[in-house]
């Protein structure tokens, strides 16, 4: 049977959690889990050849926290690990931002960890979540009605976050601490069942363990199956995308399930929260429409039109107008207007580039609105695409949409115009 240290090394290698020359910032509270994690990483540091740093936080919730911060600092010093300390007033932050104490503490803690990681060029942050934490998270999210791919909440590796203790039960970790004389502090609030996670830990999980004494292992088997399914689905989400100024432009996949899952994942990945089921159900019900938009919260959501979509802050009508000297490149949102070679050559004129306006028409009298509908130009693109007009205000060119050939020049000394959409994405 493997020792905890041997199993620790095995899981690091199996999930590729640590690589040579990594710079790892370890989040340490002083509790048994994080104290053991710091000590384990110090023991395998020479084996994997990486650098360790430590960060600890005084949340300003308990009187004992100042002493606990000192404890962590001294432990880090004994292991020759540099330690960073931060104090927060979590109760005040929670009140000001209408958050629970748990959520406020988590937000501030991760903000600090990311700041320190950036400061010291740490490419990974290690947290001490264990198998019991995973089981508690699954039950908590199940109680809230979370979907299948959000239920596990944590993986051995999420971006730059690694969780080397995720496969170990708390009792294993406590036993290792005792056998190896690793000091740790006990946070008394961990026993206060007014906090949701503690209520699940001390009241709910014991009931499940009466049904199955190996409940945590059963949860792990379930979660590992979800991880595999999650990877399979992720491989299927090969949706063509282009990102610009915090928005994600994409071609709408034909499969409804792939579209909804793509939107759910991208929203979570970029904005830190996923749309609730009611919003995603509304999305599915509107798919028969040519154009529509669904708000997920405030002015953030998804807009779909003629087989294309944009995810993020809704695109407002851009208001711009400029007369061109036809020499320098100009940016209009995601569009770049280039003058010079390899473009469409127009007759020399005093041209203006601006946004679409109600009533715009061509020299032949056709309204732009009709052209947009005929060419199936997405509604959100209409608000931002550059419109080329002559000195009389007639539209003669809309890239990829309309071209009045009467304005083309047969001479090489005309005006050469080429319009590109950043990212190589075209509707």
Swiss-Prot record:
Binding of ATP, residues: 29-34
An example Gene Ontology molecular-function term = ATP binding
User: Per UniProt, what is one Pfam family of this protein?
Assistant: TilS_C
Gene3D superfamilies attached here?
A: HUPs
Give any single GO term for biological process: tRNA modification
- Which compartments is it annotated to reside in? Cytoplasm
EC number(s) on file:
6.3.4.19
Q: Is Manganese among the key words of this record?
A: no
Protein role: Ligates lysine onto the cytidine present at position 34 of the AUA codon-specific tRNA(Ile) that contains the anticodon CAU, in an ATP-dependent manner. Cytidine is converted to lysidine, thus changing the amino acid specificity of the tRNA from methionine to isoleucine.
Q: Which family does the record claim for this protein?
A: Belongs to the tRNA(Ile)-lysidine synthase family.
Q: What's the entry's take on its domains?
A: The N-terminal region contains the highly conserved SGGXDS motif, predicted to be a P-loop motif involved in ATP binding.
Q: Which HAMAP family match?
A: tRNA_Ile_lys_synt
* Name listed for the protein in its UniProt record: tRNA(Ile)-lysidine synthase
Species of the source: Thermosipho africanus (strain TCF52B)
């Amino acid at each position: 049977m493997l020792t905890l240290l041997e199993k620790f090394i095995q899981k690091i290698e199996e999930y590729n959690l640590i690589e040579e020359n990594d710079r790892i910032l370890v989040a340490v509270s002083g509790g048994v889990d994080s104290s053991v994690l710091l000590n384990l990483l110090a023991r395998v540091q020479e084996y994997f050849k990486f650098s360790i740093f430590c960060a600890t936080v005084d949340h300003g919730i308990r009187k004992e926290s100042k002493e606990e911060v000192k404890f962590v600092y001294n432990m880090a010093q004994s292991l020759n690990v540099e330690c960073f300390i931060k104090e927060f007033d979590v109760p005040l932050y929670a009140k000001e931002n209408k958050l629970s104490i748990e959520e406020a503490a988590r937000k501030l803690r991760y903000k600090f960890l990311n700041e320190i990681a950036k400061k010291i060029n740490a490419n990974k942050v290690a947290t001490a979540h264990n198998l019991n934490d995973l089981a508690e998270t699954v039950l908590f999210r199940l109680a809230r009605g979370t979907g299948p791919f959000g239920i596990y909440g944590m993986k051995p590796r999420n971006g730059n976050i690694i969780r080397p203790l995720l496969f170990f039960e708390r009792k294993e970790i406590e036993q290792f601490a005792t056998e190896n004389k690793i000091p740790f502090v006990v946070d008394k609030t961990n026993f206060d069942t007014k906090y949701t996670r503690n209520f699940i830990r001390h009241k709910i999980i014991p009931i499940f363990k009466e049904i199955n004494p190996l409940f945590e292992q059963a949860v792990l088997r379930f979660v590992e199956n979800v991880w595999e399914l999650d990877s399979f689905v992720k491989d299927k989400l090969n949706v063509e995308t282009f990102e610009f100024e915090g928005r994600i432009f994409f071609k709408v996949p034909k499969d409804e399930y792939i579209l909804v899952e793509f939107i759910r994942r991208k929203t979570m990945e970029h904005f830190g929260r996923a749309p609730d089921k009611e919003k995603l159900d509304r999305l599915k019900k509107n798919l028969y429409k040519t154009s529509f938009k669904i708000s997920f919260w405030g002015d953030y959501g998804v807009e779909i039109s003629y087989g294309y979509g944009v995810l993020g802050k809704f695109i407002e009508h851009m208001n711009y107008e400029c007369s061109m000297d036809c020499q320098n490149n100009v940016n209009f949102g995601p569009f770049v207007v280039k003058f010079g070679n390899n473009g469409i050559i127009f007759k020399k004129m005093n041209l203006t580039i601006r946004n679409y306006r109600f009533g715009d028409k061509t020299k032949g009298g056709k309204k732009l609105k009709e052209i947009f509908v005929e060419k199936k130009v997405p509604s959100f693109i209409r608000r931002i695409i550059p419109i080329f007009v002559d000195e009389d205000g007639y539209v003669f060119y809309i890239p990829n949409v309309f071209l009045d050939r009467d304005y083309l020049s047969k001479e090489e000394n005309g005006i050469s115009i080429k319009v590109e959409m950043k990212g190589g994405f075209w509707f």
